[in-house]
Amino acid sequence: MLEAKLVIFDLDGTLIDSVPDLAVAVDNMLAHFQLPPAGLDNVRHWVGNGSLKLVERALMHAQQHADNLAAAHAVFLQAYGDTHHAYSRLYPGVPQLLAALAEQDIKLAIATNKPQQFILPILQAFKIEQYFDWIVGGDFLAVRKPDPYHLFYICEKAGMPPTDAIMVGDSKADIDAANAALMDNILLRQGYGQGMDLSGLGAMLVLDDIEALRKHWCLNTHTIE
């Protein structure tokens, strides 16, 4: 049974699988600099710490110095925007989970390291933007996860303490941020754990996927038209 009044979700690896689009953007960025493609499998292991870190990892993989990181990042952002999220997918059960939470008047928010400019368009593409009261991206504030300020900021806007909220994510950054905020948290194995043993990351609870989360919270299944 869910007792929290506010659920803060990570985005990539938690609500959506965006790696196919990210991989296209990374490979297009590398091609711009006449470098070989990284491929989807590599990109899947590199995500979770923001787009700048993703680009840095791609350059390191291509044995390039980070001197042109800013330029490469700009190329990546343009390439990612050009994908129009054509290959990203919601994880199964996400719309039903969000609808069930909204029916119980649970406030919902997103705290992600994804650049702010991409968040609302992708939520709109999947018709789930109406469920979220607050959306905080990786460049919206001066810091990003694992710094807990994203979570403090959302709680302040919601007018409630972190103890009334719960963080749901898929990475060490999510759990470190939640623990630093003294906020309850759940880690999902379905995401981009980067090959880690998720049970050892300090999460209060580790579940397989969105459906397991719905059952854990004893929420009814909703039919979404």
Residue ranges and their predicted role:
Residues 2-96, 103-104, 117, 125:
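N-terminal helical cap/lid subdomain that shapes the substrate entry/recognition surface
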Residues 1-6, 99-102, 116, 120-225:
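Asp-based, Mg2+/Mn2+-dependent phosphohydrolase catalytic module
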